[in-house]
Regions:
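Conserved HGGG/HGGXW glycine-rich cap/lid loop of the alpha/beta-hydrolase fold
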Residues: 10-66
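Conserved hydrolase catalytic core segment
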Residues: 92-123
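Active-site loop/oxyanion-hole signature of alpha/beta-hydrolase fold enzymes
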Residues: 54, 58-97, 101
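Short Gly/charged-rich anion-binding patches and loops
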Residues: 42, 80-81, 105
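Alpha-helical structural context
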Residues: 50, 88-89, 112
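A domain-start/cap signature at the N-terminus of enzymes
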Residues: 1-7
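Residue-level signal for well-ordered alpha-helical scaffold segments within enzymatic catalytic domains
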Residues: 46, 84-88, 108
């Protein structure tokens, strides 16, 4: 079984720890505050057969950037961080999947940056 690879993505908004695995169209998976590591995530693993999955540790999670101000932990700020990561990875768009608060983050992301979110059509 293929293991998750890790990269540190340096953006104008900070540096973020990102794990990736799989092939296909890009799919971002995140949780607002949980920490992911090289063992991946059961939820994210479900998508790696069809997508190149990017498992993102947001601020204050794992080796990602710390929050320097309390407002940086807001969902809209997290969307801006995700957009900076997507741009730095050179991806014109990606799909998004989240569970728990990551699901709520996905709703905010879809409202705030609709041109950059693709539908997986898997529902």
């Amino acid at each position: 079984m293929e293991s998750w690879k890790v990269i540190m993505v340096v953006t104008p908004r900070g540096t973020f720890e990102v794990f990736y695995k799989g092939e296909g169209s890009p799919l971002c998976v995140s949780h607002l505050y949980s920490v992911f590591n090289s063992t991946g995530d059961y939820f994210a693993d479900c998508f790696t057969g069809l997508y190149q999955v990017f498992l993102v540790n947001l601020r204050e999670a794992g080796a990602s950037e710390a929050a320097h101000e309390p407002f940086q932990l807001r969902m809209l700020e997290s969307v801006l961080d995700l957009e900076a990561i997507r741009e730095e990875l050179g991806l014109p768009t990606w799909a998004f999947a989240g569970h728990s608060t990551g699901g709520m983050l996905g709703l905010v992301y879809g409202l705030a940056a609709p041109p950059f979110i693709e539908s997986t059509g898997d529902y």
